[in-house]
């Protein structure tokens, strides 16, 4: 099950019957037609649970029993498309929801009453997300929440509504409509809270934290690996120089404080600078050990 489906199923289980939610669903997924010389309304979805939810909203809010039809997508036997259809009291329902325009169509923008009322806005956003919303799987590490609108003015009104809740919302126009979207993880989590998806928010946050933790571990591991490689390369260079000194003038030619450093390094190629310092009879700092190793390398290079 996709992350989007998980969120939608969670908010479908919330016990609510709000006209503003239904308004968003009709505006974004509905179309008008004529049936037996009467105005008809068809609301289309690919999710059976959303279709049943729309049916329940219409039944509870307007005491009507619409019809649910379905058909298969062309060549995709497993993908059903559901239509919630009604041809009774359509004009009255649209008028009550303030959706009808003067040309017997559906208004494309968002009513000012919804834009100015937080509770109405939350319900509208819930309906909008159920209709055409999607969230990119947070496991991908690229965060995005999108809501598609057929009309640009609706997408822009939707952005204004989301911005009221302090969300950094953007709109992009496409050939067949416009998308209102969020790209910041914190904004997406806030949006999930707004529409009532607390479990979705927690799941999103957990995935985000786990990804960040894994990335931190990987960065630390990469840094440690690089440091180990650097230490080994430096160790090999110094050991080669110690062998050069041994074969030409002998280690006994070195000052006594360098001889012991050379012996430890040659005997323990894998030792860190701190481990070499800890192996000395006379305590020495890491910088002191480094200084002596540089001296040994310089002596070998001058031979």
UniProtKB/Swiss-Prot annotation:
GO terms for biological process: cell division; regulation of sporulation. Keywords: Cell cycle, Cell division, DNA-binding. One of its GO terms (molecular function) is DNA binding. Gene3D superfamilies: Homing endonucleases (3.10.28.10). It comes from the Bacteria. The keyword Cell division applies. Residues 272-303 bind DNA. The keyword Cell cycle applies. InterPro entries: Homing_endonucl (IPR027434), Sporu_reg_WhiA_N_dom (IPR018478), Sporulation_regulator_WhiA (IPR003802), Sporulation_regulator_WhiA_C (IPR023054), WhiA_LAGLIDADG_dom (IPR039518). Involved in cell division and chromosome segregation. NCBIfam families: DNA_bind_WhiA (TIGR00647). Belongs to the WhiA family. This is Probable cell division protein WhiA. It comes from Streptococcus mutans serotype c (strain ATCC 700610 / UA159). The gene is whiA.
């Amino acid at each position: 099950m996709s992350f989007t489906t998980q969120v939608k199923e969670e908010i479908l289980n919330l016990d609510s019957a709000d006209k503003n939610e239904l308004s968003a669903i009709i505006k974004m997924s509905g179309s008008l037609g004529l049936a037996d010389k009467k105005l008809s309304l068809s609301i289309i979805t690919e999710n059976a649970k959303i279709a049943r939810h729309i049916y329940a909203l219409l039944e509870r809010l307007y005491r009507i029993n619409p019809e649910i039809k379905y058909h298969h997508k062309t060549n995709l036997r497993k993908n059903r498309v559901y239509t919630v259809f009604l041809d009774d009291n359509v004009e009255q329902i649209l008028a009550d929801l303030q959706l009808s325009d003067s040309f017997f169509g559906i208004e494309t923008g968002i009513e000012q009453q919804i834009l100015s009322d937080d509770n109405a806005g939350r319900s509208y956003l819930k309906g909008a997300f159920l209709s055409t919303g999607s969230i990119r799987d947070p496991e991908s590490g690229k965060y995005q929440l999108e809501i598609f609108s057929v009309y640009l003015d609706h997408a822009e009104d939707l952005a204004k509504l989301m911005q009221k809740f302090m969300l950094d919302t953007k709109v992009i126009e496409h050939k067949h409509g416009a998308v209102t979207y969020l790209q910041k993880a914190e904004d997406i989590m806030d949006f999930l809270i707004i529409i009532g998806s607390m479990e979705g928010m927690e799941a999103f946050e957990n995935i985000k934290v786990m990804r960040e933790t894994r990335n931190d571990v990987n960065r630390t591991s990469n840094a440690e690996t690089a440091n180990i490689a650097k230490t080994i390369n430096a160790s090999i260079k110094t050991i080669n120089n110690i062998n050069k000194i041994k074969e030409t003038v002998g280690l006994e030619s070195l000052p006594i404080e360098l001889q012991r450093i050379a012996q430890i390094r040659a005997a323990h190629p894998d030792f860190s600078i701190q481990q070499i310092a800890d192996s000395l009879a006379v305590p020495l700092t890491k910088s002191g050990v480094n200084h002596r190793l540089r001296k040994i390398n310089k002596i070998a290079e001058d031979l």
